[in-house]
């Protein structure tokens, strides 16, 4: 893993960035696919209440998953930094300390999700017909939260080492098992939302076992010792990077939970339509998300090696790649959102509501190509406190108030509610540009 392919400090930026990003994107696509399979199979073989339960419950699971992913970004950045600085002997402490920290987090999440599943479902304002199914989905996923957390931490370790292909294999295993599980439990045994949750947990568990076996057998550029598995100074270092990102992501996801609650008040069909739209949104956001994760690894190595100009060039390269793909995704979502929605359900009313939301959301596919590339650049530069601050501003001062205002209007429009996301992203871009200019003030133009 220390070969030329994982050395981002030399060679073509475009080729190396795309080569590293593609497996990351592939893993995200498969991850979104097995999440979409839950909704697809329940939509086809379950009930409308089950569809609403899975869509609402998956919002809670997304909150947990995305926060853990951002917190583990600290591990990715720190490993990349130590590789760039030629100090691989420090990586063992990062991984061992990370295992301890995330084990504690898993225990806390288990207790909260299992014991408070129903209050969480009520807080989410799940439709009355779907409260029990939502609580069941959350409770079962909470029971297996250790595997969900472990997968994301292991993926962060491999990406930090410059290996984006192994996480792709992990999620491929999970995707296959989840599809088989959904078909067996939901389509075959008619277990509705509960079957989808069991399949999700089983898939993640198998993926974690596969990842651990691969990590143990792999020739690593460092030594992992028993004494590494304790609280150590590396824990504070990766938390300094990851914690601000996790806080920002937590509030962002809470804003989406609040948005889900706003829309749930509009009825069962609107709730189900929003759930379908969210699955399409997850796919639409894959390229920006892959860029952000890849950019953090790419930039952290170059910053560690003192190649700051190359780090800046990689950000602009990422923006260019993101915008080219983003234009295609925008046209597909805006013009053919109804066709995409019909993949998940045959209910015409649900399809119509999903498409209404997508029409307002569509510009987000362009804005995030810029925003996420810049965020990845700042993450790699250890400017995660700023990333958190801009996230809080656009979430608490723009997205949530605007979405709430739109949701309480007479004959509330899902299209207008959907527009809250791209408007808040535009604010985030302005803040990022300001921070970038401030960081590089006084530098001579080349």
Where are the model-predicted features located?
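Short alpha-helical transmembrane segments in multi-pass integral membrane proteins
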Residues: 1-21, 79-146, 188-243, 299-364, ...
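Small-residue-rich hydrophobic transmembrane alpha-helices
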Residues: 51-111, 148-167, 273-337, 368-390
